[in-house]
């Protein structure tokens, strides 16, 4: 959030300058800066007697005259912005009476209405259910790909950041900054160090979080594979029952999750017939259980 506030001129950097189109952002007038950059923050906007259309129309402020009168072209852009976030059906509703998901879409429509080069969003998926998160991020992705708008946003959900980002910046608690492509940043060992994960694990491949594995002599042997064993692994972990699993190919979709949760995983290299050694090992752990 601090970095974003430097980008949108809410805070001044302790050193250096923020440059946009080769120009210090502090040298832009308010209207010209608003034409370049729009902002969607997490703070709830308090309004009185304003419809959703009225709120979206505020995005035309940089283009209107002293009296703020909208032209037919402005009205067309307001309608387009509402349509782009699938909010035409709530355009005439009182903004203060709509849901959090709808409110976020209206605020995004207002930002779109400014016709900026850059949209900055601070934790836009906070307080949204999974459906509205997907819809919101889909809108942002379409804007970036189809309209060539630069989207800068902060997210706590790293699994979502992994899916939608071209570039990622991670800021560690001690101030260390990691910057790169999702493929460079979202690796299990990097995430473990970044968040100082000591108990449990995060799986970058699936974007899943696993709680700490239970240690001790395995009391259950799970013959999983193909993803069918995952729910059993998590159930056993939930009830604090140590278990072993196998025989699983190392390219099986559940292999990494089994490694995170099982005391012992009996595995084989991809596309190999199970060896006698693996079969004997599996039998041993079945007998132990």
Residue map of PLM features:
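Conserved ABC transporter NBD signature motif
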Residues: 16-24, 33
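Conserved ABC ATPase "signature" region
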Residues: 57, 72-92
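Helical segment within the ABC ATPase nucleotide-binding domain
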Residues: 134-147
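Helix-to-loop junction immediately C-terminal to a conserved catalytic motif
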Residues: 8
């Amino acid at each position: 959030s601090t970095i974003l506030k430097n980008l949108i001129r809410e805070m001044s950097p302790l050193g250096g300058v923020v440059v946009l189109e080769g120009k210090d952002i502090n040298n832009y007038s308010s209207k010209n800066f608003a034409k370049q950059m729009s902002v969607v923050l997490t703070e709830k906007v308090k309004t009185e007697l304003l419809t959703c259309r009225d709120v979206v129309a505020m995005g035309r402020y940089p283009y209107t005259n002293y009296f703020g009168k909208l032209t037919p072209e402005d009205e067309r852009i307001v309608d387009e912005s509402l349509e782009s976030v699938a909010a035409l059906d709530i355009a005439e509703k009182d903004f203060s009476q709509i849901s959090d998901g709808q409110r976020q879409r209206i605020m995004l429509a207002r930002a779109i209405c400014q016709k900026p080069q850059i949209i900055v969003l601070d934790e836009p998926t906070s307080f949204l259910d999974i459906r509205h998160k997907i819809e919101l991020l889909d809108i942002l992705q379409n804007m970036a790909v189809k309209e060539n708008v630069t989207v800068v946003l902060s997210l706590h959900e790293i699994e979502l950041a992994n899916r939608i980002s071209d570039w990622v910046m991670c800021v560690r608690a001690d101030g260390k900054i990691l910057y790169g492509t999702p493929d460079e940043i979202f690796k299990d060992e990097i995430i473990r160090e970044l968040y100082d994960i000591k108990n449990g694990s995060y799986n970058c491949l699936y974007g899943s979080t696993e709680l700490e594995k239970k240690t001790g002599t395995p009391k259950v042997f799970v013959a999983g594979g193909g993803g069918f064993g995952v729910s059993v692994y998590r159930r056993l972990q939930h009830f604090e029952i140590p278990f072993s699993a196998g025989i699983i190919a190392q390219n099986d979709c559940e292999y990494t999750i089994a490694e995170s949760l099982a005391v012992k995983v009996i595995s084989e290299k991809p596309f190999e017939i199970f060896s006698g050694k693996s079969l004997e090992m599996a039998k041993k752990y079945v007998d132990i259980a």
